[in-house]
């Protein structure tokens, strides 16, 4: 399976979940991301485009994820990368810290396609946004707290065991195992 990402950490996480089922190779392809409020639509579109770009012979997976902030009615959601690139985590925290409702969720969707079928698998983790803490992880990890720790304070192993992407990858692994029986 080719995992379409430039993030080696995501590839390693996928390898942990899929090791007994398939090999996972990183595929660096910059597909055009459609604008949609649906993570599943974005990931499925990306997987289908990447499958063609990769030669159409090996299955591919694409993941899309976002931070959904309660006090902002779920924004930035699918637009999280754009907001992070534009404002940065510190500025997002500056906006969020004034909110009464700082509940948040990381939601992710992994899309798989082999050219014949496209399937999507979603995962989420609930938390709260807090002042930045920790030095690990990436993106919004320093401000996303789950069970008393920010994702940036957790070990990679602990974070991956809890993460939205990990939960989606576990569902993909179950589906692949059932399909291959």
Predicted regions and their residues:
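Anionic-ligand binding patches
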Residues: 2, 9-181
């Amino acid at each position: 399976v080719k995992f379409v990402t430039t993030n080696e950490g995501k590839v390693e996480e996928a390898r942990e979940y899929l090791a007994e089922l398939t090999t996972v190779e990183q595929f660096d392809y910059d597909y055009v991301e459609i604008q949609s409020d649906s993570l599943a639509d974005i990931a499925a579109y990306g997987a289908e485009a990447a499958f063609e770009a990769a030669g159409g012979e090996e299955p591919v997976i694409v993941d899309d994820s976002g931070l959904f902030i309660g006090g902002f009615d779920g924004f930035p959601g699918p637009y999280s990368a754009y907001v992070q690139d534009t404002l940065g985590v510190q500025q997002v925290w500056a906006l969020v810290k004034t909110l009464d409702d700082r509940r948040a969720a990381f939601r992710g969707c992994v899309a798989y396609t082999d050219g014949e079928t496209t399937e999507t698998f979603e995962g989420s983790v609930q938390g709260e946004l807090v002042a930045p803490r920790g030095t690990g992880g990436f993106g919004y990890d320093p401000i996303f707290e789950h069970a008393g720790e920010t994702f940036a304070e957790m070990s990679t192993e602990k974070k991956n065991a809890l993460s939205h992407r990990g939960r989606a990858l576990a569902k993909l692994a179950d589906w692949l195992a059932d399909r291959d029986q």
